[in-house]
């Protein structure tokens, strides 16, 4: 009996820990150990989800549209750039250092500059998402290319395969696990970057709604938005995992 109980606790230790934190959090709020503007209780946040569900749904859909569009474009650009950088050594030497420099600049610092150059429409948001999502994918795929078996590359060359045949039949399959590793990071970056870009202006989106809630002192709604963004990012990463299992079938074997 005790052994079965320990086994169950080990399997569900993350859930138990999460429920424990929520319980302590709720009790601390009930006893008013923390002011509401610092940390609303889980129950208040849940009530905000129910109360503001229509607004949350509307602004979530607006954020999702921008994030998914930017992510798709970012993935396409990253894949094309990776192939070119792998084929042309001089292009890799030219672009890679600049990409590293761009990644060291905080997103919140780049966003106002893009707004200044491109206006308050959707374009600066898309560009910002592309800037943040391409780098993890490019680095991951290039790493996958570098881990290709040299003996297999030699074999393809002896069979007189051209560079595109080597890429399609060998390099791409080998680098797919690396691609998905980078895609997981880019998915989370896409949603976070979208919310950050919405802070700077606009009429819809979770970032805009968060700023509006802050001005109205609706701190429970602010926390609800934060949790919602996190859940959307986790859902996106889970979808990537599911896609990977179906695309890379040999990995399961």
For each predicted feature, which ranges?
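Periplasmic/extracellular loop-to-transmembrane helix junction in inner-membrane transport proteins
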Residues: 3, 31-75
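Generic hydrophobic transmembrane alpha-helix motif, especially the helices
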Residues: 100-136, 143-144
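Transmembrane alpha-helical segments of polytopic membrane transport and secretion proteins
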Residues: 1-19, 238-253
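Transmembrane-helix boundary motif in ABC transporter permease subunits
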Residues: 69-99, 116
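Short cytoplasmic-facing helical segments at TM-TM junctions of multi-pass membrane proteins
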Residues: 144-182, 206, 210
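Glycine-rich helix-loop "coupling/hinge" segments at transmembrane-helix boundaries
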Residues: 116, 192-229, 248-253
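C-terminal transmembrane helix and the adjacent membrane-cytosol boundary/short C-terminal tail
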Residues: 89, 146, 223-253
